[in-house]
Every structure is written in structure tokens, then in C-alpha cells.
Amino acid sequence: GFGMALKLLKKVL
């Protein structure tokens, strides 16, 4: 889902 993508993005950023 989109929430998962946001979590991964926050990890990278």
C-alpha cells in the first residue's frame, strides 16, 4: 500500500 512506500521513503530520506 501507499503507507508502506511512505515508510520506506522516510527511512531513505
From Swiss-Prot:
Any one GO cellular component localisation term in the record: membrane
Keyword annotations: Amidation, Antibiotic, Antimicrobial, Fungicide, Membrane, Secreted, Target cell membrane, Target membrane
Principal location listed in the UniProt entry: secreted
One Gene Ontology term from the biological process aspect of the record: killing of cells of another organism
Tissue expression remark: Expressed by the venom gland.
Keyword Membrane: yes
Outcome after substituting G1L: Slightly reduced activity against Gram-negative bacteria and fungi. Increased hemolytic activity
Subcellular location: Secreted; Target cell membrane
Residues the record lists as Leucine amide modifications: L13
Stated family: Belongs to the lasioglossin-like family.
Task of the protein: Antimicrobial peptide with activity against Gram-positive bacteria (B.subtilis, S.aureus and L.monocytogenes) and Gram-negative bacteria (E.coli and P.aeruginosa) (MIC=1.3-35 uM). Also active against fungus C.albicans (MIC=6.3 uM). Has little hemolytic activity. Acts by disrupting membranes and bacterial cell wall structures. Binds to peptidoglycan and lipopolysaccharide (LPS). In the context of inflammation and cancer tests, is weakly cytotoxic to normal cells, induces calcium signaling but does not impact cAMP production.
Protein name: Macropin
Gene source species: Macropis fulvipes
